[in-house]
A protein has these predicted regions:
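N-terminal targeting segments with Sec-dependent signals, encompassing both cleavable signal peptides
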Residues: 1-471
Length: 471
C-alpha cells in the first residue's frame, strides 16, 4: 500500500552538512519504523546531494525484512550479487531503527549550491515503490567567498591656531675678500653668484604682499689660520660690510639688522674633517681640534703636524668653506581666508599655518584627492608636529597604506585621537586584541568615532570565527 513510504516511516535530522577545507562533512540521523517492513520486503534509503546542475548519490542504507535478509546473505555468499555501494545493510529491528549516517566526501565547487535529500524505495513481492523524497538539509554550509572588509571611521584633530605666523628664510653666502681686507667687491671671484643668493632671498620676502619683514640676522665666520684676535676683528668687519651692502641695496634701516661674530669656525672645521676621509693623519688632526688649547696654539700645532701635509690639505680643501656668512631673513605672514589658502598652498605652503591648512582641507570633500593632498603637504611642512602626523596617518589609514600610517603615528604623540588611530591601524592589520584595547581606551577618553570602529571589530571577529570554522 502507498503509505509505506509516508514520512512517519522514515524521519531525518541533519546535524551537519558543512565544508571543511577540501572535504564535505555529513552527519545525519535517520530513524526508521521497523514494524512497517514486512518479512519479504526491504527498504532502501539513498542520500543524494543535488543542485540545479548536478547530483551525486551517496552509499545507501538497506533495511531487510526477516526473509529478505536471508535471501540477501545467501546471494552474497554465492557471489551472485552485484550490489550498489552501501553505507549499511542490516535486518530491520521490529521497532525503531536509528542509523547515524556520518561520512566525509571530497568537496566540489558545485556542492555549495546543493541540498541534501533522502530517497526511500520499498521493495517486495516483485514490485517496487518509491516514496516521497525527504529533504535532510536545504543547503551546504560553505566558506564565504569574501572576507569581511573593515570600514574604518577616522578622528581628525583641528590644530591650535598660531597667534603670529613667524617664518624665516635661511642661507649661507661664501664671499671672497682680498687677503686681510673686508671691503665687498661684487665682481671679485664668485661674489656675483653669492650676493645674488642673498639678494634673491631678501627680494622675495620684500616683494611678497603677504609678508612683513621682521629682521635680518647675519653671522660671520673666519677660517682658523693666523691670529685669533685679528681673525675675530676681520670676521666682525666683514659681516658689518655685508649688512651695509644689503642695507644700501634695499634701502633698509640699520635697526633691521642683528649682527653676530662667529670668529674662527673650529666647530665647522671639526665637522668637515670628521666627514672627509681623505684628510691626512685625520685622527691626529681631530685630537688637536678637540684639545683644550688656545686657538692660536691649536693652529700652530696643526701647521707643525706631520711635516705640514695635513695643514696644506685643510688650507686648500676645507678652510675656504669656513669663511662665510650665515643669514636668516625673518618675517611675519598675514592670515589667509580659505579661498586664499587654496591658492597659497600650491605655491608657498610654508606661509600657511597648520590651522589654515586644516581649514583648507575641510573646504574639500572628506577623502577627496584635494583633501588628502592638503594633509600630505601639512606633514611635509610640519614634519615633527604631532597633529600634522596624526592627520596624515588618518589619510594613510583611509587608503589602507599601513606602513605609511605606522611611520606617521610614531610622531603623532599620545592624544586620545592618536591612541584611536593606533587602534584603527591594529584593526586593519588584523591584531584584533590590541585594536580592542586601544579603541576602548580612546572611547573612554571621549573619541566618539571609537564606537563605530568597535562595531567593525566585532564584525571582523565574527567573520574570523566563521572562516576558521571551515578550516
Amino acid at each position: 500500500s502507498s503509505d509505506v513510504c509516508s514520512s512517519d516511516l522514515v524521519k531525518v535530522v541533519c546535524n551537519e552538512l558543512k565544508q571543511k577545507g577540501n572535504e564535505l562533512v555529513i552527519d545525519a540521523v535517520i530513524t526508521v519504523d521497523g514494524s512497517r517492513i514486512k518479512s519479504r520486503e526491504n527498504l532502501s534509503l539513498t542520500p543524494v546531494l543535488e543542485s540545479a546542475s548536478q547530483k551525486e548519490g551517496l552509499p545507501s542504507i538497506l533495511l531487510n525484512g526477516r526473509i529478505s535478509q536471508k535471501v540477501y546473505d545467501r546471494e552474497i555468499a554465492l557471489n551472485n550479487l552485484q550490489d550498489e555501494p552501501r553505507f549499511l545493510v542490516v535486518q530491520a529491528g521490529k521497532s525503531e531503527n536509528v542509523i547515524n549516517y556520518k561520512t566525509v566526501i571530497p568537496f566540489e565547487p558545485w556542492m555549495k549550491d546543493a541540498r541534501f535529500v533522502l530517497i526511500p524505495n520499498m521493495c517486495g513481492c516483485g514490485k517496487e515503490e518509491q516514496g516521497a523524497l525527504l529533504v535532510m538539509a536545504d543547503k551546504v554550509l560553505t566558506r564565504p567567498d569574501k572576507r569581511y572588509e573593515v570600514q574604518p571611521t577616522l578622528a581628525y584633530i583641528s590644530p591650535e591656531a598660531e597667534t603670529v605666523k613667524h617664518r624665516a628664510e635661511v642661507g649661507t653666502a661664501y664671499l671672497d675678500f682680498q687677503v686681510g681686507k673686508y671691503a665687498i667687491l661684487p665682481d671679485f671671484r664668485n661674489n656675483v653668484v653669492e650676493l645674488a643668493k642673498i639678494d634673491n632671498t631678501v627680494s622675495t620676502v620684500v616683494n611678497d604682499k603677504n609678508i612683513t619683514l621682521e629682521g635680518i640676522i647675519l653671522k660671520g665666520f673666519a677660517s682658523p689660520e693666523g691670529s685669533y684676535k685679528s681673525n675675530t676683528v676681520l670676521a666682525g668687519n666683514r659681516v658689518k660690510a655685508l649688512a651695509e651692502y644689503i642695507r644700501k641695496k634695499h634701502d633698509f634701516k640699520p635697526e633691521l639688522f642683528t649682527l653676530d661674530n662667529g670668529s674662527e669656525d673650529w666647530e665647522g672645521l671639526k665637522a668637515k674633517v670628521e666627514a672627509d676621509r681623505s684628510v691626512p693623519s685625520r685622527e691626529a688632526v681631530l685630537a688637536i681640534i678637540n684639545s683644550n688649547d688656545e686657538p692660536d696654539k691649536k693652529d700652530a700645532r696643526l701647521a707643525a703636524l706631520d711635516g705640514g701635509a695635513p695643514y696644506r690639505y685643510v688650507l686648500k680643501n676645507i678652510y675656504p668653506s669656513l669663511r662665510r656668512s650665515d643669514y636668516r631673513v625673518a618675517y611675519q605672514v598675514r592670515f589667509f581666508t580659505v579661498e586664499e589658502g587654496r591658492e597659497i598652498i600650491k605655491t608657498r605652503p610654508q606661509q600657511l599655518s597648520l590651522s589654515e591648512m586644516f581649514a583648507v582641507a575641510n573646504s574639500y570633500e572628506i577623502g577627496s584627492k584635494e583633501y588628502n593632498e592638503v594633509f600630505e603637504i601639512a606633514v611635509r611642512m610640519y614634519s615633527d608636529d604631532p597633529v600634522a602626523n596624526l592627520n596624515a596617518a588618518n589619510i594613510a589609514l583611509s587608503k589602507n597604506d599601513l606602513d605609511a600610517a605606522r611611520t606617521y603615528l610614531a610622531k603623532a604623540g599620545n592624544s586620545p585621537e592618536a591612541i584611536h588611530a593606533r587602534g584603527v591601524l591594529n584593526l586593519l592589520d588584523g591584531n584584533l586584541d590590541e585594536a580592542g584595547k586601544l579603541l576602548e581606551q580612546a572611547k573612554a577618553a571621549g573619541v566618539k568615532e571609537a564606537a563605530a570602529n568597535l562595531d567593525e571589530l566585532r564584525k571582523k571577529e565574527a567573520d574570523n570565527q566563521l572562516f576558521d570554522s571551515f578550516e
